[in-house]
Design a protein with these regions (language model features):
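Single conserved hydrophobic/aromatic residue that forms the stacking wall/gate
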Residues: 1-10
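Short, well-structured alpha-helical segments in soluble
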Residues: 14-24
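Well-ordered alpha-helical segments embedded in enzymatic catalytic cores
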Residues: 12-16, 62, 112
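Phosphate-binding and adjacent anionic-ligand microenvironments
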Residues: 22, 26-28, 32, 49-51, ...
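Short Gly/Thr/Asp-enriched flexible loops that form oxyanion-binding sites at enzyme active sites
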Residues: 37-55, 92
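Catalytic or ion-translocation cores adjacent to nucleophile or general acid/base/metal-coordination motifs
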Residues: 53-67
Length: 307
């Protein structure tokens, strides 16, 4: 059994709000889960059709906005940092790098982002962070993913974009043009029961014992094994990963910029594959072609991995 994950859930839950937004000609729809820690958003594309913005895209836009404002206001003094989980898009690291902001990687789960904030408290300034699963946090006063402050900030981003003659969707396209195109896709392979748990264990063992040499037609250039805390390059050189503890996660990076993260779920009988492929987008109107090319890459990756 395969499913796409949280994106499908938010698509269903946002449908009533989107229908109302169409009636009142709204610019933005936001929805949180019952405990108000995650937030999903939708906005109109260039054709006026409502589209769901995924967690990676939301994180990109809100961090892009925060860093832009920090830079314009002269608030970047040195020592500022952001945090993302290891399965979140690498594109936000490019945004941070261009603005001379340190971007830290941590394990999935906001306790790890909160840990990085605590470790640097009084020495560095946390600006923002997030994860692909629709969790975001700006500033450091909550120490957990928080849909309330995230909704306020997303609304501010949308208002800022509108003041500059753009929609939220057009802002997203501008980010892709400036930093490169990225498409993310999560596959959840469900393996129920005791036999399923054994099968998932065997899959992870096989990935470690027989790492792929190429994925989707591109050579694997780097492997990160968070269970052994080892980083292996294409020449077989091994170095240590700087992480607080081990975790049953594997990551493969290819020459063309593709990133694949594999990990068993800690709460459900499934193994998760996080796929991120890269491309170029020369202009905002090039989105359709860039997305189509990225979709081909995603399918090639899935075929290589047999998922």
């Amino acid at each position: 059994v395969r499913s796409r994950g949280l994106g499908d859930v938010y698509k269903r839950q946002l449908s009533m709000a989107v229908n109302l937004a169409k009636e009142i000609d709204a610019d933005l729809v936001m929805a949180s889960d019952p405990d108000a820690d995650r937030v999903g958003i939708a906005c109109k594309d260039d054709k006026g059709e409502w589209v769901l913005i995924n967690g990676n895209q939301t994180c990109m836009m809100y961090l892009y906005y925060i860093l832009t404002q920090y830079k314009q206001l002269g608030k970047i003094k040195g020592g500022e940092f952001c945090v993302k989980t290891i399965v979140t898009t690498e594109l936000i690291k490019k945004i941070a790098d261009k603005n001379n902001i340190e971007m830290l990687d941590c394990y999935t789960g906001f306790k790890w982002i909160a840990r990085e904030i605590r470790l640097r408290e009084g020495k560095q300034k946390y600006i923002g962070g997030g994860e692909e699963s629709y969790g975001f946090l700006a500033e450091d006063f909550v120490r957990d993913k928080d849909a309330v402050s995230a909704c306020c900030l997303i609304a501010e981003v949308a208002a800022w974009a509108k003041d500059n003659g753009k929609s939220l969707y057009q802002l997203l396209l501008d980010i892709y043009v400036e930093y490169g195109f990225s498409k993310e896709f999560t596959v959840n392979v469900v393996k129920p029961g005791k036999s399923g748990a054994e099968e998932i264990k065997a899959m992870m063992e096989n990935f470690r014992a027989n790492p792929p040499k190429e994925i989707g037609g591109s050579a694997v250039s780097l492997i990160k094994d968070y269970k052994t805390l080892e980083l292996t390059d294409a020449q077989g050189n091994v170095s240590k990963l700087d992480m607080p503890e081990t975790s049953n996660v594997l990551q493969y990076f290819t020459v063309d910029g593709t990133k694949i993260s594999v990990r068993p779920s800690g709460t459900e009988p499934k193994i998760k594959f996080y796929i991120e492929v890269k491309g170029e987008m020369g202009c905002p109107k090039c989105y359709t072609s860039a997305d189509a090319e990225a979709e081909k890459k995603v399918e090639a990756v899935r075929k290589s991995l047999g998922i």
